[in-house]
């Protein structure tokens, strides 16, 4: 099985050294991600593409590799191809006929060829010869040069013929690590997840910083989103997850800051803390999900006041986005259902927030704030390797057993998404299996028969462990994790 990964146009116009460096980084990313799926994957970097090969030609492996390639930043498009050597144009025709004869039956088609190397023919001749031959051989097919049903793509490189069997649209953007590191402030809502995704797509290795205002359940939810984003779009590179207990800071603000200034002061405290964390981690910029005018703290005046507490660059990828645009992207990338279950905590501490904060007034209110509280919570920041979030969840749910053999009368709850469940159904014979996607579990688990024992199941055990912790924290004791 072979794939040809095309380069982003913005990479191809770089200087030769930069283009080579970016392509090498992309090759490394592709290799790192795909070898998590198939250890037999090999890659080869060319000037204008990257070749990906594997000896495992099974449909299941192909599907997993295709889905992974679609989510790697820096890939605008990739091709599934059949590669072979050829003798002449007629040989190209015969090889193309063997691959595409069935696909053009009762359809209109055209042939498009790209050629590199020295040959006694040009691309147009290949298109005409192969297209004419297919038209004669497949009687029900008809040539149509504009808007055909099927376009047959051929690529010729010296003596090698690449017959494209399928073209896939990639994520686009830049390869991760071609830009510098950023620290994304995660609340768990739609905005912070989408802004993190935008920076990953742009090639920045994106670390996550969470200010906990809502207890362990809130932290579990944000960890889920952060792990999901990393695992789906950024798994080629290690990143960190920083967890800061911000409840003491909120308490200090509630006690000592005038009500209308609370929202802006809270955001300034978060930026101060994030700046210290970024400096320690040698991270070059902060990322927030703020969108201009969306809430009271996100007016131009207030954002300007918030910015004044740091010299570190603050990136706001969603500044000009409407809320519906953000939700649409969240749905597309898969974070919408996570975010639906996480309440917004930042907005609850100020009843009549100012939309035009005055810097001197804010600084006066902050004069009543005990900054030792902020220093203390920053010094106690918990730092995780994002890859260890699953392991950390396992340690935290020590009261939840991991079950290999299903007890009598126990019910298995498959918490995978409907798509995952459909692709790989969980078949357990006579055992009762309920299907409740992880993003609905928090609202639907309480409706189940509480006299029964429930075993949560997902493919890798990460989501099931995190969900078990969430249910434990909410008082449900009849929960275990099923790990066959």
From Swiss-Prot:
Principal place of residence: cytoplasm
Catalytic activity: [ThiI sulfur-carrier protein]-S-sulfanyl-L-cysteine + a uridine in tRNA + 2 reduced [2Fe-2S]-[ferredoxin] + ATP + H(+) = [ThiI sulfur-carrier protein]-L-cysteine + a 4-thiouridine in tRNA + 2 oxidized [2Fe-2S]-[ferredoxin] + AMP + diphosphate; [ThiS sulfur-carrier protein]-C-terminal Gly-Gly-AMP + S-sulfanyl-L-cysteinyl-[cysteine desulfurase] + AH2 = [ThiS sulfur-carrier protein]-C-terminal-Gly-aminoethanethioate + L-cysteinyl-[cysteine desulfurase] + A + AMP + 2 H(+)
Keyword tRNA-binding: yes
Ranges that cross the membrane: none
Compartmental location: Cytoplasm
GO biological process: thiamine biosynthetic process; thiamine diphosphate biosynthetic process; thiazole biosynthetic process; tRNA 4-thiouridine biosynthesis
The THUMP domain, residue ranges: 63-167
Cystine pairs: 346-458
Alphabetized SMART domains for the sequence: THUMP
Residues forming the catalytic site: 458
Listed InterPro entries: Rhodanese-like_dom, Rhodanese-like_dom_sf, Rossmann-like_a/b/a_fold, ThiI_AANH, ThiI_fer, ThiI_N, THII_Thiazole_biosynth_dom, THUMP_dom
Signal peptide: none
Matching SUPFAM superfamilies: Adenine nucleotide alpha hydrolases-like, Rhodanese/Cell cycle control phosphatase, THUMP domain-like
Pathway assignment: Cofactor biosynthesis; thiamine diphosphate biosynthesis
EC number from the UniProt entry: 2.8.1.4
Function according to Swiss-Prot or TrEMBL: Catalyzes the ATP-dependent transfer of a sulfur to tRNA to produce 4-thiouridine in position 8 of tRNAs, which functions as a near-UV photosensor. Also catalyzes the transfer of sulfur to the sulfur carrier protein ThiS, forming ThiS-thiocarboxylate. This is a step in the synthesis of thiazole, in the thiamine biosynthesis pathway. The sulfur is donated as persulfide by IscS.
Family to which the UniProt record says this protein belongs: Belongs to the ThiI family.
Protein name from the UniProt record: tRNA sulfurtransferase
Organism annotation: Colwellia psychrerythraea (strain 34H / ATCC BAA-681) (Vibrio psychroerythus)
Encoding gene per record: thiI
